[in-house]
């Protein structure tokens, strides 16, 4: 759970923090990059409406967790390989990342046998997970500055999402 939440937050922080710069590097205008960035934030809210409708019907949530994690992986890679489709990749990433966050927090409650255990699991998963996530944007920014483009940071996010799956 800790790794699942941490990787999701790391990838989300990298994309939310660097998406406008990524889009500008691919020829988008500042207005276009800002609009796509806004779509990302809206797309992360949609799973809050959709995921609960599906979750209560599933006995095993691993399949949906893997699917939404792979949405993050494919969309991060897509931003590099097919930047002309950035709106689609952003919407897919937003949905996947939002759903992953909901699932990660839900897993804590599902795995705990008591309120005390849920609080302990939540504290550990979120504190370690967010500590990991906080390293993402500066690290990927440094990699970008060293490499000169966003290929390695985006592919690193895609690979991290595969690990999360």
Task: Name each model feature, range by range.
Residues 9, 13, 94-102:
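Small-residue-rich segments within alpha-helical transmembrane domains of MFS-like 12-TM solute carriers
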Residues 1-48:
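Extracytoplasmic gate region of multi-pass secondary transporters
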Residues 99-113:
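Intracellular juxtamembrane helix-capping segments at the cytosolic ends
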Residues 112-151, 157:
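A late C-terminal transmembrane helix in Major Facilitator Superfamily
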């Amino acid at each position: 759970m800790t790794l699942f939440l941490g990787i999701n937050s790391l990838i989300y922080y990298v994309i939310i923090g660097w998406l406008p710069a990524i889009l500008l590097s691919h020829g988008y205008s500042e207005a276009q990059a800002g609009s796509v960035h806004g779509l990302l934030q809206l797309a992360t809210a949609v799973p809050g409406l959709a995921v609960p409708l599906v979750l209560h019907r599933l006995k095993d949530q691993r399949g949906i967790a893997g699917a939404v994690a792979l949405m993050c992986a494919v969309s991060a890679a897509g931003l590099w390989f097919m930047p002309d489709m950035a709106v689609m990749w952003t919407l897919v990433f937003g949905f996947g990342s939002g759903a992953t966050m909901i699932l990660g927090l839900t897993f804590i409650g599902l795995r705990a046998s008591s309120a005390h255990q849920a609080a302990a699991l939540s504290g550990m998963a979120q504190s370690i997970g967010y500590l990991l996530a906080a390293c993402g944007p500066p690290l990927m920014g440094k990699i970008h500055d060293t490499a000169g483009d966003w290929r390695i940071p985006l592919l690193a996010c895609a690979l991290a999402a595969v690990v999360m799956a």
